[in-house]
């Protein structure tokens, strides 16, 4: 590799913590949130984000069908779109087309304004839902970034810029990891394991989400249960249980149960439980159009629900994943990042994405809360999430998939 080429690092971190809560009788929609429903900017890019989410999911699923998957399409797409502001030529086109944008159908200004509004909306204070994102730009002291790039990533992507001494890789690593740890409230530590000596800049994106269930589980109803990883493997997990009314339907197209559980605030978790032997069919068949139908047509029924407590982590080298989606130039010696800086040729050395998911019934917010529901006299069906299933965390105002994943083994 020519010594004149310096390296950049793309680091993306996501944390999704699903905690209990209570029914909020006084939850009112603010004027600001009403405006969001009518604001077209982030809605323009929402279908592309959903398409990208499923594209990325399928690439990861093909890499391994025996491991958990968890990632934030919003985090990955935001960082790449921000980086695209400093790219030119094929490098530029590959990134935006890899994010499922058709540049003949959508103006580039609309794309960046869409992300700008998305980030503004997601970061709006909400006392019911903790949701924050951050973009950090770590720049070597010897490197001067182009003024336009710096201005654009600050204005459109709310980026913070930090001066970093990359010649001291341990100190640089500590600075970057500290930024991520603080942004994810201590949940993601040591996001960067190693830094190459040629690294001169790092673009770091994090997303932190902590949601409280509208209808929490009771801790005393959690008991040990079986989770069937595959035909040959069964593991013991803490299985939460609640008898009540849930948004649940059976989809014959997907051969799956579809459960929607709302958070206090403006987000929903969608869990898809395929029939035995139908996981591959579900992965191949699910689309953004089918997902949209579920969100619009909800069916409430009484169910005895069993759901595993879990904490899973997804860590990915995005270089191999993104190359499958056609994003290759930015990682090669042919990369054109001249919009970032003209001082030295740059390429992206690697892209790292780490996301953590925790689902439980705990939390002081749920203490002393009682939710009473009318239950019919006939015995309701049991629905047990005791085999591999998919999860999508969806934010309603922006119509965005915040997180996507697959739980194969809750104990991993």
From Swiss-Prot:
Its main location: secreted. GO terms for molecular function: serine-type endopeptidase inhibitor activity. InterPro entries: Serpin_CS (IPR023795), Serpin_dom (IPR023796), Serpin_fam (IPR000215), Serpin_sf (IPR036186), Serpin_sf_1 (IPR042178), Serpin_sf_2 (IPR042185). GO terms for biological process: acute-phase response. Glycans are attached at residues 65, 102, 165, 266. Residues 1-24 form the signal peptide. This is Alpha-1-antiproteinase. The lineage of its organism: Eukaryota, Metazoa, Chordata, Craniata, Vertebrata.
